[in-house]
Regions:
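Polytopic transmembrane helical bundles with strong interfacial aromatic enrichment
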Residues: 1-149
Length: 149
């Protein structure tokens, strides 16, 4: 029962995180760029990240903790290689998330508060690059999950 609960929490966290990044990158970003100028668009992103990132911080902790527990519950030597790939790549994704949440997002928020639109735009561009990286890494994690079955 514990394994199923951990697996459920892991999958909910992963699907929320990847789905949120996918929506932001492929849907919200182009729509906001099409209809909003930087003085409206950049505060929208700042407010969106202020809601999304704390939720994803919880998801990242749940994903890593549940994944690590499941990995150790079968033993590192007995775990399929896909599990090791998932945890390793997921750990890299967590570091990338940490850079966004703890370093780049505060710059975006501060630049928006100061109405420094070029600098806020540069911070948003960096976040976009890091989200793109995490989307690619997330696809690798999903492929590893499929191969581990």
């Amino acid at each position: 029962m514990l394994r199923q609960t951990l697996l459920l929490l892991n999958l909910l966290g992963v699907s929320t995180w990847l789905g949120g990044m996918f929506f932001a990158y492929f849907c919200l970003r182009p729509a906001a760029a099409q209809v909003l100028q930087p003085p409206q668009r950049l505060p929208l992103w700042s407010a969106t990240f202020a809601r999304f990132l704390p939720l994803m911080a919880v998801a990242v902790v749940v994903i890593l903790a549940s994944g690590l527990h499941m990995l150790f519950s079968v033993g590192l030597g007995a775990a399929p290689i896909g599990w090791h790939v998932m945890f390793g790549v997921g750990s890299v994704m967590a570091v990338v998330f940490g850079v966004v949440y703890l370093w780049v997002f505060p710059r975006l928020k501060a630049r928006c508060a100061a109405s420094s639109w070029p600098e806020a735009g540069a911070a948003l561009h960096r976040i976009r690059q890091l989200v793109a990286l995490n989307l690619v890494l997330g696809a690798v994690v999903v492929a590893a999950a499929v191969s581990a079955r």
